């Protein structure tokens, strides 16, 4: 009889189900693992044999063949130890292991070690196989217990896993764990946020227009570029935006944790949306991601999914990187294709850029002379193509900073966050599945209702500035967010006027 327990391996960022099969034949004693198993799985033979013998199990004097199916799929990870050990320990018992999954690296004493790399696999299994029963390390219970629709049995030792399989009446652990974060409830769904502001907008002096643009961008996930002289507060404003972004659903928190684990970062839960800030010298693969068949890694763009991607000194990024941004900015996905592999990442993020007006930075200064020649200014401006700029919703030229300026509007991060929460509620009450800045054409028609005055103003702007269809949709979406910040059901003339004022006209 061939017994089977299921496990999984990560392939191109997705969990692929693996059937772990075992047969025992009368022949010279041997222990063979087949099915494109890498060295970490091959080394399981020593760990499993020692763990069984140290727990009073007689290792069978037979030829043991472990097959990992499908055989053409490369597999890796020490978490295959547990299913292999269970199949060997239960060789003489006829048990039905249908829909049973087991994950865990064994110590030589049989204890199951923590392994946060299992998390992305469990997350995918919960979605694709809602009836699956999973045995996982007790040490990772705090991390795994939040995954919805997952029947999980947490064990500390190999013997506990064995007992669970031999006693099917044992119930899965009930997960009552809740995240210790602030919440709001909308449409019977909880959203999590933080009311701790490590950086506060009240510290920003002057720059009322830029602060308002930051508020609108945060509330609707609208792409933003701030342009101004060095030291005027561009980065200061953008670094504070991360603390006023909209709250997250549980699924978004889980997805962000999955991405961090895949990129070999920490596995903690956070009530803040991800904030990625790559340096201008970063390589193309580090920003776009790797599509290597063996170890694909998400890049900065993928890690910013559902969060914020900040490019400081925007024109100094490589031209091919800036042009590669056009697809994820427009379609909210990034496809990386190679000869032997292809991987797709979700990329619904808020893009924010900061730039000087010229190479020396003094073009907009009222006190310093610009040292650039006209040709240099033109070359600098041309680093950002028109198709790229057309994907930017909000463009602000900031005034030169003045030490004597008082904090503008007396806006604090807490106040701005409350307005963002108000706009977020308006969007969710309309049953929107996406932020205003990410609405498609059909959703724009449905949710972006203009009154007569706003419609007339938009038509005049289209005729005067020759706006593209993309630009028109961008203006409508920004106006929708401005209306939400004012708790207005329809887009009015004042909202449209403000949205047009933030549009970069060629």
Residues of each region from the PLM?
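Peripheral, non-AAA+ core regions of ATP-driven protein-machinery
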Residues: 1-225, 232, 236, 270, ...
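Basic, amphipathic alpha-helical bundle interface domains used for macromolecular binding and assembly
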Residues: 34-45, 60, 67-77, 293-296, ...
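Active-site phosphate-binding and catalytic loops of NTP-dependent enzymes
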Residues: 53-62, 92-100, 226, 249, ...
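Short loop/turn elements that form and flank the Walker-type P-loop nucleotide-binding site
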Residues: 59-62, 96-97, 129-130, 219-221, ...
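Residues immediately C-terminal
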Residues: 108, 309, 316-317
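Conserved alpha-helical scaffold flanking the Walker A/P-loop in AAA+ ATPase domains
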Residues: 215, 269, 274, 282-309
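Walker A/P-loop
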Residues: 224-265, 331
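Walker B catalytic acidic pair
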Residues: 228, 306, 312-314, 324
């Amino acid at each position: 009889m061939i017994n089977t327990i299921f496990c999984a391996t990560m392939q191109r960022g997705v969990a692929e189900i693996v059937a772990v099969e075992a047969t025992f034949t009368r022949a010279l004693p041997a222990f063979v693992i087949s099915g494109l198993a890498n060295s970490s799985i091959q080394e399981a033979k020593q760990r499993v044999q020692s763990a069984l013998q140290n727990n009073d199990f007689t290792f069978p004097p037979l030829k043991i063949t472990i097959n990992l199916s499908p055989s053409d799929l490369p597999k890796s990870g020490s978490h295959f130890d547990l299913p292999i050990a269970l199949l060997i320990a239960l060789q003489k018992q006829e048990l039905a292991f249908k829909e049973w999954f087991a994950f865990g690296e064994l110590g030589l004493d049989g204890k199951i070690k923590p392994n946060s790399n299992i998390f992305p696999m469990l997350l995918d299994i919960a979605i694709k196989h809602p009836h699956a029963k999973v045995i996982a390390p007790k040490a990772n219970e705090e991390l795994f217990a939040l995954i919805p629709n997952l029947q999980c049995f947490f064990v500390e030792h190999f013997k506990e896993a064995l007992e669970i399989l031999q006693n099917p009446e044992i119930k899965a652990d009930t997960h009552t764990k809740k995240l210790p974060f602030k919440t709001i409830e909308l449409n019977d769904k909880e959203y999590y946020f933080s009311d701790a502001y490590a950086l506060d907008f009240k510290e920003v002096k002057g720059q009322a227009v830029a602060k308002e643009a930051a508020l609108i961008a945060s509330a609707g996930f609208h792409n933003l570029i701030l342009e101004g002289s060095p030291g005027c507060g561009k980065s200061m404003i953008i670094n504070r935006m991360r603390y006023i972004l909209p709250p997250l659903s549980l699924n978004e928190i889980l997805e962000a944790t999955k991405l961090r684990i895949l990129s070999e970062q920490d596995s903690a839960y956070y009530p803040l949306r991800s904030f990625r800030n790559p340096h201008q010298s970063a390589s193309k693969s580090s920003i776009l991601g790797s599509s290597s068949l063996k170890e694909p890694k998400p890049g900065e763009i993928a890690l910013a999914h559902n969060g914020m991607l900040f490019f400081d000194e925007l024109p100094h990024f490589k031209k091919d990187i800036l042009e590669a941004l056009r697809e994820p900015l427009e379609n909210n996905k990034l496809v990386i294709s190679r000869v032997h592999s292809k991987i797709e990442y979700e990329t619904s993020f808020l893009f924010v850029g900061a730039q000087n007006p010229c190479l020396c930075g003094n073009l907009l200064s009222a006190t310093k002379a610009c040292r650039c020649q006209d040709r240099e200014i033109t070359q600098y401006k041309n680093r950002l193509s028109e198709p790229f700029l057309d994907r930017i919703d909000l463009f602000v030229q900031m005034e030169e900073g003045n030490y004597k300026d008082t904090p503008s509007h007396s806006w604090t991060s807490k106040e701005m966050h409350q307005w963002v929460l108000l706009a977020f509620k308006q969007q969710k009450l309309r049953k929107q599945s996406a932020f205003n800045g990410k609405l498609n054409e059909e959703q724009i028609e449905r949710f972006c209702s203009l009154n007569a005055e706003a419609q007339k103003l938009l038509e005049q702007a289209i005729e005067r500035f020759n706006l593209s269809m993309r630009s028109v949709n961008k203006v409508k979406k920004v106006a929708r967010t401005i209306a939400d910040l004012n708790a207005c059901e329809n887009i009015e003339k004042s909202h449209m006027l403000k949205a047009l004022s933030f549009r970069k006209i060629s």
